[in-house]
Amino acid sequence: MPAARLAIMADDTNYGSLGALAPNWSDGERNIDTDEIYERFFEWVADVKGVEPWPHQEEAIMDLLAGDHVILNTPTGSGKSLVALGMHFAALCTGRRSYYTAPIKALVSEKFFDLVEVFGRENVGMITGDTHINADAPIICCTAEILANQALREGRHADVGCVAMDEFHYYGDSERGWAWQVPLLTLPNTQFLLMSATLGNVDAIADKLENMTDTDVDIIADAPRPVPLTYEYTLDPLEKTVELAFGRGETPIYVVHFSQDAALETANALASTGVSSKEQRAAIAEAIKGTKFTTAFGKILQRLLRTGVGIHHAGMLPRYRRLVEQLAQQGLLPVICGTDTLGVGINVPIHSVVLTALTKFDGTKMRKLRAREFHQIAGRAGRMGFDTEGLVIAEGPEFEIENAKALAKAGNDPKKLKKVKRKKAPEGFVTWNENTFDKLIDADPETLVPHMKVTHSMVLNEVAQGGDARYRIDRLIDDSAQTPEQKERLHDRADEIFQTLFDTNVIETEDRDDGGKDYFMTVDMPDDFALDQPLSPFLLAALELLDPESENYALDVISMVEATLEDPKQVLRAQERQARDAAMIRMKEDGLDYDERMDRLQEITYPKPLEDMLQAAFDEYRHDVPWANDYWLSPKSVIRDMVETASDFTGYIARYNIARSEGTLLRYLSDAYRALARTVPLEKRNEQLRDIISWLRVVVRSIDSSLVDEWENAGAGTDASEAAANLAAPGTKQAVVEDRRGLTVLVRNAMFRRVQLMDLDKPDELGALDKDWGYGVHEWEDALDDFYDEHEYVNTDAKARSGELFILDDSKENSEHSWKVRQIIDDSDGDHDWAITGTVDLDTTQSSGEVVFFDYSVSN
């Protein structure tokens, strides 16, 4: 919880200690000479950090104090963060606003809290697509795209004194690299610190930066690794490799996979082999005591952790990832199985890295690892202050491991050796060997290939700056590090965009006396159109197409919002798979032949409500609002599907069998909640939509509260210190029910889900839901038999789901923390003599995100 974390920091003895050594930002006098800055900073490093700086750190900070740019191309663990601290401190002492940029929000957020701790909350702010905290602070943490857009919008006039660009190897990213290049080209008065462990040859970047800013660029690339690495290639099975490393005390071990499924498969295998001691398992059990593993994957994780095996990948809930990181930081996990995401911003101290392959699927094809990818992963081995060396082990391909096993079994017996049948690589398999490994070890990271693009958003940001926007866009292209052919294509693209903006009367020009032109916009452009919700204006316009009196109005609003969100691909694939499976069964029953079934199957995909209407509206919108051409709609039904099927988080995960993608679903639900809460005007919300928004908040917050708290305490315009004070206020009495509307919807959905399953005659699913409170499969079979003896069917229409058939008694809310609820079943005869009745455990329900009962019955 960000605000709570800020409150805790305020009690730290060293909180804000570096910021206290700088002049107050609001004072007029802020010019301390460089010698004094150097002395104050390194005294603080010695007294507070308790470390002695390395020569390359001192050199980098002296270069920065001299006004030079610095490219810090030094190994993982070599103290790049300390150099960035020195830059921020120097900026604070000289009245310059400084920026820290990173590629992912999680890393930006982590750095924000780190900087708050040393500089004080009044000196540090954060800006991401959906979060603004103390945005006028002298030190700003933000994503690279935020700074790039500001650079385009404000140019040389931007209040950006210096920038520490972390993970600068993203300069070579084909999709996002433009955001790392643009500031270098458009901020001539800004000082840059470019940092990464895997930059490769940066001479071209240094030359370009020096030419653009007329300032020297110092490259520091000769720092030794604080913890040297040793390398080992093995044909032992993975379990044996881990067992041997464990026996030699070479833990913690991070086993790197290139898919989430493979990571879980290995974790399960290792959990049964005994990779932890009795003492370690006892310590882990104590450390996770009180942790709630409420989801399907949570129960898997709990079992793995108790054996000493962790798992870490992007598909997990954030709180589970943080738990694994915390246990690793405490030295409690001997083995962690994860994906290659550990290379960016993941704080997991490890001694040994084991690569299960030297190839990966890049979204298009299987290929061998690039040198940069290899060093990014391998560089995490070896813990500064703990290890004298780190270990990097690469596993051979599976077929080679089996061949080695067969040869070892044959021993030195010539006859047996002759009989060994060597396996070959499967057809089309991209293989590797020890030579591949050796080449990767010796290879320097590839020279970064620059990337640039021109979009409507970029052009409009330049127009917003005033003056001759076309000249500046042409200069941006000409100054870029792209090839002549690429520049020609970029100029052509700029021609198209400017012509579109003129044709649609979005921009106009005025001639200047000096022969130049001034560009200006004729329409108001949303302040955040290029950030996290660029299609919000379209959504507001599209809402006018809906009839508020329609019974589907709330669901249609949800479908419109969902169409503007990023796809949760694993969830959509599961929906499509289930739809195709059901269609295949129907087609077989209808007697269709195989070829026809296959042809029809290709046409079946996941649900896309309002697709035709939305696409027609969007086509018209793009004609009037050209910058929307940078984006696209993606109709889908996840929130709507959950509402229509009365599903909670756990039930939805089970329904589509996506336990390994819990984090993906939760992030999507969180994004949907934010979009609904922020974008849909109050006057466009009916009672049902307000209920759904509240329910969604309860679901997200109960599964992982940080995703809601981070936005509500920080992103909705609340000052961080104010949020901290609010959350830390002593004596605050918490209500038993935090969000009555949302919790009521959660309970009503749970009750009606049972009604839907009664209609489908699904005693197995009902029993799975209710076995913990005495209504297992057999009890439900008996209840359904009795019900259908009296009535022909169950209604599940809007009337059956109405509030008239749901009764809530909250008289014991405060005394017993419970609600008595009764869902009357709308039977075929309209007798309404059957009902599901239960006493809801409010505390457990709110913490778990699914309804938990004290007692329960189904009867007439």
Task: Report the location of each language-model feature.
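Compact beta-sheet-dominated globular domain cores
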Residues: 826-860
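SF2 helicase motor core recognition
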Residues: 150, 332, 336-353, 380-389
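Conserved C-terminal RecA-like helicase domain
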Residues: 99-101, 109, 116-125, 261-335, ...
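Non-catalytic terminal extensions of ATP-dependent helicases
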Residues: 310, 329-330, 413-416, 421-764, ...
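Conserved segment of the helicase C-terminal RecA-like domain
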Residues: 352-355, 359-361, 367-408
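Conserved interdomain hinge at the start of the Helicase C-terminal
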Residues: 232-258, 265-268, 322-331
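Helicase-associated low-complexity/disordered flanking segments
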Residues: 1-62, 66-70, 275-306
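Conserved P-loop/Walker A NTP-binding site and adjacent catalytic elements of P-loop NTPases
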Residues: 44, 50-228, 234, 252-277
